[in-house]
Amino acid sequence: MKTLLLTIGFSLIAILQAQDTPALGKDTVAVSGKWYLKAMTADQEVPEKPDSVTPMILKAQKGGNLEAKITMLTNGQCQNITVVLHKTSEPGKYTAYEGQRVVFIQPSPVRDHYILYCEGELHGRQIRMAKLLGRDPEQSQEALEDFREFSRAKGLNQEILELAQSETCSPGGQ
C-alpha cells in the first residue's frame, strides 16, 4: 500500500511535457508554492484512489530540484508524502526514487494550471499517471477539458477522477 501511495504522491508532483507547449524551463520558482490537485487518471486501474487530498506544496531546491509535499486520505488513513524531484538535463523532466520514476512538469495552456505526468513501476508493472493541478481550489472547466484532451492524446483512461479538496487530513472524515 505504501508503494502505491508513494506512486500516487509522486505522480501528483509530475507534469507531462506536451508536444505543442513549451516545457518548464530552468526556473523552478514558477511552480513553487501551494497547488490544488483537481483531477487524476492513469493508463490502468489504480487500486487505492485517495478519498481527499490536501494542497500540495512545491518548493524549489538547490540545483533546480523540487521538493513536493502532500497528504492524502486513503481508506481512512492520512498518508504524508514527501518526494524530491531531481532535475535532469532535459527541461521539465525530473527523476525520483533513485531514477525508478520519471516525472515531467508541463504548464497547461489554461492560466495557473499544470498537467502532471509520471511514468514508473508499481507492484512490478509499468504505470503512467496524469494529474491536473491549479492554484485555486475551484474547478476550471476549461482546464478540465484540456486535461481530458491531454489524457486522450497520451492513451490514458478517459474516466477522470475529480478529487475532493481538504485543507487538513482527518481520518474518518474529509
From Swiss-Prot:
It comes from the Eukaryota. InterPro entries: Calycin, Lipocalin, Lipocln_cytosolic_FA-bd_dom, von_Ebner_gland. Disulfide bonds join C78-C169. GO terms for molecular function: small molecule binding. The keyword Transport applies. GO terms for cellular component: extracellular space. Its main location: secreted. Coiled coil: none annotated. The keyword tRNA processing does not apply. Residues 1-18 form the signal peptide. Keywords: Allergen, Disulfide bond, Glycoprotein, Secreted, Signal, Transport. Tongue epithelial tissue. It is found in: Secreted. Glycans are attached at N80. Belongs to the calycin superfamily. Lipocalin family. This is Major allergen Can f 1. It comes from Canis lupus familiaris.
